[in-house]
């Protein structure tokens, strides 16, 4: 099983993240969106394992996007993947909208890209936008 665990310290605007085999979260900060270089083994594979923790201080307008691989690895009828790059560009182009609106937009774009083909994997998004 994969998981991503995050804690948010509101007063300090500090986010800490650990990843257990989930897709790398995306961070929009200072006008650019990129992957958080954080990986780890899925839960339950090894009896004893430790996970790296990544931390950042966020500012108003910063956006963090947790997503399952069912977003980037969704394929269209030609076998092309939606891809992390397309997801990253959507976030950069629409960074001014709210988290709910961004989630709806991304899922609509994935549906349009796949031409509403049946789901082959889950499509999970959690979006945090700092106010």
What label would you give each PLM region?
Residues 1-131:
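Conserved subregion of the PPM/PP2C metallophosphatase catalytic domain
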């Amino acid at each position: 099983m994969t998981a991503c665990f995050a804690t948010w310290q509101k007063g300090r605007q500090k986010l800490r993240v650990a990843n257990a085999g989930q897709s790398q979260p995306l961070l929009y900060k200072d006008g650019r969106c990129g992957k958080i270089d954080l990986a780890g083994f899925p839960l339950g594979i090894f009896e004893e394992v430790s996970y790296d923790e990544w931390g950042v201080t966020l500012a108003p307008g910063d956006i963090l996007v947790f997503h399952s691989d069912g977003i980037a690895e969704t394929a269209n009828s030609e076998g092309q993947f939606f891809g992390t790059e397309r997801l990253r560009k959507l976030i950069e182009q629409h960074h001014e909208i709210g988290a709910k609106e961004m989630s709806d937009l991304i899922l609509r774009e994935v549906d349009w890209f796949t031409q509403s083909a049946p789901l082959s994997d889950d499509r999970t998004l959690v979006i945090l936008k700092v106010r």
